[in-house]
Amino acid sequence: MRFIISGKTKSVYNFGRPTTKDTDMGLSTHVLDTMHGCPAAGMGVELYTTDGEQATLVKRFTLNHDGRNPDGPLYDNANLQRGTYRLVFDVKGYFAAKGVALPEPNFLNRVALDFGVAHTDQHYHVPLLVSPWSYSTYRGS
């Protein structure tokens, strides 16, 4: 099933997968493999809440074919709390599984992104563009 619904203030795009209104999405991530030009399917990710030096594991998951959490948003707006979070991406494991010859020690092993959530009524999207030698992130929409 493919459809596009568009309105004055909100748009929902569905191309064969379940939809979630953007107003329901509190926290999400998406990883693109810039070496191969594709989503980072199979990469392991961990989500933590952080308080100073203390980090508490919330969830471990493996990215789906689209480079996203297979269960949808990591938090919806109803459950997202104001505070600091950490996403940890297993870059070395992902590229090793893809058969990329990596030096020892590898330049990037795990990429940890620490970020804050100030407004729980907004969508926080944390994309990662990554290769064995570099990464980039930004607050997406």
Q: Model-derived features: where do they sit?
A:
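Compositionally biased low-complexity segments at domain edges in trafficked proteins
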Residues: A118-S141
